[in-house]
């Protein structure tokens, strides 16, 4: 098996998300191509060491001028390549690190969100309502199964998200009607699949081995199920997958333009706006951390910079003489 295929397979065995597997494979390929350019020949990772990784990371920081987050992503991927795929611990690294910028997220106010949602429809609108109304990542929205939404308790169970953690978040009352309609749409797709003998969806790795029959259950169908069937890329069976997050991202950009919003608006902007709005309305930083699923509260504290500072409540002197 080729080394890049080994990266993909190792990610699958460890039950990493498809996005993580794709990212790790991409960085492994970029690294090996860079080594080839430097040495003039292909070199197997077993013949490389920490100095090669340090040189590549330094190249990213000094020549390509990547962001600190990008360099850290590359580092994680290469540590995975050596430790988990090749089986070599390359020890501590001493590369030049990219400078981390002081990033303040772009957020929308309530009027802007209302305008944005007004130009969205169907699954695009519902996905955005869950990102803004429950603080979900776009990947978490599209990973939801029918069973993860409890309409009675008004909760959403986010399973095995970033960092392989589960968490419970609120289900916005305003989204319940749309959730019911979407679940009914999925039920119709499920009934069609049962009739054609192809009611099957992909299950999480460990659970798939323990309970393979669950792949044919309506409870495990994606809430944002694709309208078209597709074949599993590895095993070849015909079934359903969820809609692609890129579709809603394109819709958001178009909706923002039509609404006359001149800020940069992405799926993550809605999550940022959720966090900021909760804080401005009296939520604690700890509550926001738990709702967002952050491991480190320092990650959450960046939203404190987005809230309206108390100093802005001071009346401008110009107002007194106007």
Description of each model-found segment:
Residues 1-322:
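Conserved catalytic core of the tyrosine transesterase superfamily
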